[in-house]
Design a protein with these regions (language model features):
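Short alpha-helix capping/helix-loop boundary micro-motifs
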Residues: 57-63
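A generic structural signal for residues embedded in beta-strands
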Residues: 75-76
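Short beta-strand/loop turn elements enriched in aromatics
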Residues: 30-46
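Short glycine-rich, flexible loops that bind phosphorylated cofactors or substrates
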Residues: 83
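Non-catalytic DNA-recognition/assembly elements of restriction-modification systems
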Residues: 1-18, 34
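Short coil/turn segments at secondary-structure boundaries
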Residues: 21-29, 49
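Basic, amphipathic alpha-helical recognition segments used for DNA target recognition
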Residues: 6-13, 41-50, 67-70, 86-90, ...
Length: 125
């Protein structure tokens, strides 16, 4: 069996998160799961199910965040940097993330989770 090397951009789409205005109270306490890097550091888990706050459809529509389908990788890119989780529910994130939506025909989410965690120092550089 021959293994093929890929660049991350060849096996995944990478999306930034975004934050709805916190001045607009009706952007929050909705039904859309929303993650912050602090949520990942507080949970200290391989899997992400729920953050400390949800956003509303209005909040979602008001910013450039993307809905990340379940079973992909959330990677914090701001303090704290280099935290990873596999989202077990559809969710969106704040701007402190690079969200990695994998081509599952080419790679496995669990493999990529551990691969990225192992290479976190190279990613941070």
């Amino acid at each position: 069996m021959e293994l093929k090397k890929y660049k991350l951009g060849e096996i995944a789409e990478i999306y930034n998160g975004s934050t709805p205005s916190t001045k607009e109270f009706d952007n929050y306490d909705g039904n859309i799961v929303w993650a912050t890097p602090k949520d990942l550091s507080d949970q200290n888990s391989k899997y992400f199910y729920q953050g400390s706050r949800n956003i509303t459809q209005k909040g979602f529509d008001s910013c450039s965040t993307q809905l990340i389908p379940a079973n992909n990788i959330l990677m914090s890119s701001r303090a704290p940097i280099g935290l990873f989780a596999i989202n077990k529910v559809d969710c969106c994130t704040n701007q402190g993330f690079k969200n990695i939506v994998l081509d599952k025909k080419i790679t496995d989410v669990d493999f990529m989770y551990y691969f990225l965690k192992y290479h976190v120092k190279e990613i941070e550089a």
